[in-house]
Amino acid sequence: MTSKVANTEVAQPYAQALLSIAKSKSLTEEFGTDARTLLNLLAENQQLRNFIDNPFIAAENKKALIKQILSEASPYLRNFLLLLVDKRRIFFLEEILQQYLALLRQLNQTVLAEVTSAVALTEDQQQAVKEKVLALTKARQVELATKVDSDLIGGVIIKVGSQVIDSSIRGQLRRLSLRLSNS
């Protein structure tokens, strides 16, 4: 199995090439939407991921599947993925798409805020988190990636880059426990 660093090194030039294509055709947001959809599809469908990652499956079979899945997508994106199959780089598809989205966020001055909460956040709560992150980062936009972790008991943990804001009840209990053990 290859390391995350090696995957990133292989994926970065392809992600930059994809962004270059998207910018030249004014399709950066459309590619971003398609990349998110494809990443969600790969995350939800282990069979699809196994099919794409399997080196013993013929390239023509992979190409046929890509053409079928991306029939509604931009032909530029579809051809890019077909090129990845030809170059035997389709194994790095997820990392390439994640790198593309990171480059797109950078281009749009958007930050990714990973929000973990005890229960699913309402639209109002998500908007409040976005406003808080905007105030902290001075970015133009915020993209939220939310997940639920019932172990938090209540509250949220917000991660933006290397900065973590822990306002969860679990975090507060941990800090209280540390203070009590130090006194």
UniProtKB/Swiss-Prot annotation:
Keywords: ATP synthesis, CF(1), Hydrogen ion transport, Ion transport, Membrane, Thylakoid, Transport. It comes from the Bacteria. It is a peripheral membrane protein. One of its GO terms (cellular component) is proton-transporting ATP synthase complex. The keyword Glycosyltransferase does not apply. The keyword Ion transport applies. GO terms for molecular function: proton-transporting ATP synthase activity, rotational mechanism. It holds the Pfam family OSCP. It is found in: Cellular thylakoid membrane. Gene3D superfamilies: N-terminal domain of the delta subunit of the F1F0-ATP synthase. InterPro entries: ATP_synth_OSCP/delta_N_sf (IPR026015), ATPase_OSCP/d_CS (IPR020781), ATPase_OSCP/dsu (IPR000711). F-type ATPases have 2 components, F(1) - the catalytic core - and F(0) - the membrane proton channel. F(1) has five subunits: alpha(3), beta(3), gamma(1), delta(1), epsilon(1). CF(0) has four main subunits: a(1), b(1), b'(1) and c(10-14). The alpha and beta chains form an alternating ring which encloses part of the gamma chain. F(1) is attached to F(0) by a central stalk formed by the gamma and epsilon chains, while a peripheral stalk is formed by the delta, b and b' chains. This is ATP synthase subunit delta. It comes from Trichormus variabilis (strain ATCC 29413 / PCC 7937).
